Structures are given as structure tokens and as C-alpha cells.
Amino acid sequence: MEILYFGVLIFAALAGGKLAEKMGLSNVVGQLLAGIIVGPAMLNWVPSLHIIHVIGEYGVLLLMLNAGLETDVKQLKQNMKAATYAAVLGVVLPLVTFPILALMFGIQLQTAIFWGIVFAATSVSITIAVLNEQGKLASTAGSVILGAAVLDDVMALLLVAGYAMFIGGSGLGPDSVMPLVAFGLGLLVRRWSGSSHFLELSNSIGKWTLFPIFFGSIGLMVSFDNFWNEAVLLVILTIVAVATKYYGAGWGAQLAGIGKTDSRAIGAGMISRGEMALVIAQIGLSTKIINHMEFSSFVIVIILSTIIAPIILRPLLEQVTD
């Protein structure tokens, strides 16, 4: 029976991803929504089984390994100053704002800090697609976004590791540090001449099995219990998630000497949360730092930010310099 559940989840996630792409959305959004639809929150075709989440964890590790394999350290040298400023301010602003917001809602300090870490992470997979679509990937804005995204991912992982030290190891165990290890391993393997073939193979394996299981399993954990009671919080979280990245990364780029128009595009390009934020949120749930209600809210906000980002970015890219 478990094999059947896996089959349904993978099929639904892959189909959802394809449908999302046709609608101009991120593949990840489609897979997440598919998990929500077939999971306990809606159709209840696939229960939230422990084995599904265990296999999904391997998807996380492969995802982070591939992130390391795809990270071009040389890319950081191009527009390094602007990328650094955009990444740092784009991380600092949500890292400060979300804990304050959480404390206002009565969340304990330890958990409030984790809120900031979750929303400090950025995913630019959808941004890269939009940049490619409009031929702006090699533009100044495109280059800064790519460089900032690399730094952003590294900082997000370091924040998780630092948080583990902050709480004295009581919440995050060795399993929680494994994504960081996988990312580092990817960076090392990238130096090998055959790394491109290895990346192609691991991407193929992940694309058809582990990735849809991971993203689909995230959807299985979403609950709409007390959804309407949390509607105001969801709206606030989404607005803050969009604003902190847009203004944080945008201001950072401007401080580095990038023009206002390009800086706005850079800010918009950093709005989307995705894989990294989901990985961090998953760590928080599995280690009981956040509860299921918070986790569900985070997933919904991550989905909304991924949908909103290209809507803001597309018109701004038409104005940027090449």
C-alpha cells in the first residue's frame, strides 16, 4: 500500500509541476500544491506517513548537493560588491523584522528567531527562468541576482548552523546539519572534471523521484485547520516577506552603486522563497522548533511569494540596462 501512496504522490507532484510551468509559475509551487491536494488537507488520498518524509529527507540532501554542484564561485567575483550588499541586507532585514513580528504575536524568542531564519532564505529558480525568458540573465541585474543568491544560500545554511549553537544543540541534531554537509560536498565535487555529468545524473534522479517526493511531502503536512483564524497572519507574513527582500536587496544594490531601476529589479528578483526556505522550515518542524500550524502558514507564504515575485519582476526587467 505504501508503494501505491508513493506512486500517487510522485505522479501528482510531477503533474502539478508541469501544470504550474505551463501557467508561468515555478515547478516547485505546482509540486507543493499537488501534495496539499492529494494529502490530508484536501482529498486525503495520500496520508502523511513517516516513511514518505524519511525518503523526502534524501531529496533534501540531493537538492543541497546539487546546489553545491551548481554554485560557481567565479560568479561571485562578478559584481561582488553589489551581490554582497544585496545578499547581506536582503538577509538582515527579514532576519530582524520577522522575529519582531513573531514576538508581537506572542511567539517565544527562540522560535521567533527561527522565523527570521526561514524567511531570510531566497530561491531564485523562478527568477532565473524569468531572466532567461526576457534575455536579461547576462545583464547587471541578472548577474547581481545570481551572485547574491549564492551568498544568500550560504548565509542561510550558516544561520541554521549558528542557530543550532545558539540553542545549545537541544533542538537541531546531526541530521539537521546534513544539508550543510551536502552543500559543501557539492562544492568539492564541482572541482572534479566530471562533475557536470554527475550533476546531470543526480538531477535526473532527483527530478523524477526524490524531489517530487520531498516537495509533495511538504504539502502533505499542510493543514487548513483554523485557516481563517490565521488569515490575517498569512496576509501580514506575505506582505513582510515580499517587502523585506524587495527593499533589503534593493537598498543593498543601491548602496553598492547600482542604479535605482536595476536595484528595484534586483530586489524583486530576490523576493521568492522556495527550496531553501522549505528545507529550513522542515528542519524546524521535525525538531519541534515550530508547530504544524506555523509550518503550514510558512508553506503557504512561501508559495505566495513564489507566485508574486515574477509578477513584480517582469515589468521591472523591461526597464533594466543590459
Task: Give the positions of each predicted feature.
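Transmembrane helix-loop junctions at the membrane interface of multipass transporters and ion channels
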Residues: 159-173, 220-232, 281-292
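Structural signature of hydrophobic alpha-helical transmembrane segments
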Residues: 1-9, 48-65, 109-125, 174-185, ...
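Hydrophobic transmembrane alpha-helices of multi-pass small-molecule transporters
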Residues: 1-28, 170-178
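Alpha-helical transmembrane bundle and helix-membrane interface signal
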Residues: 73-78, 128-173
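Membrane-interface junctions of multi-pass transporters
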Residues: 19-27, 37-82, 176-237, 258
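Transmembrane alpha-helices that form the ion-translocation and gating core
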Residues: 81-136, 229-320
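Small-residue-rich segments of transmembrane alpha-helices in multi-pass membrane proteins
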Residues: 31-41, 64, 85-99, 147-161, ...
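Transmembrane alpha-helical segments of multi-pass membrane transport proteins and ion-pumping complexes
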Residues: 9-18, 35-36, 40, 58-62, ...
